[in-house]
């Protein structure tokens, strides 16, 4: 609930009236993905998306950013890595970070373009330790990609890890999970989803 200000000085978070695609935890904030926006709560006040004072910007204030691209960028999922929060749309990946600054604040937070790989929005990207894996189902068979070194300074490295077994992957893969301790990846099809076969 808004305690201070009005619609001009303390406007509603951009998720109001829109579907929330995903909720993740990032740097002591709850992050909501809604349409092409990412909205982060106040620091350590996980369900508060309002500023505390309309007079000045605080480092703990909520963050509300929009991704921008030449393609539609509805955001579906996100995974944290060393460089920040890697965010997935159906056709691109973005990085939410504080740039060279140590603290993630409303003034330092920014979303930058990272890569342009198709992502199966019915699936979830998975952390593989220091890298991130994700499914792509735009070809005849599904593909599994691994993205690493995502930062604001360099282009990430993206490798198709499923190339060696490409013809064994059905096109409608939707579930992937990883066990870094056992060096194991498991893939499955969720038969409750309406996906192409």
Describe each model-derived feature in a short phrase:
Residues 4-15, 22, 29, 133-139, ...:
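Elongated fiber/stalk and passenger scaffolds
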Residues 11-36, 72-79:
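Beta-strand-rich domains and repeat architectures in extracellular enzymes and scaffolds
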Residues 37, 44, 66-197:
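Beta-sheet-dominated scaffold domains
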Residues 2-18, 54-71, 158-169:
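A short helix->beta-strand "capping" segment at the edge of beta-propeller domains
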Residues 5, 13, 28-29, 83, ...:
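Homeobox/homeodomain signature
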Residues 1-5, 11, 33-60, 96-104:
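Beta-propeller domains
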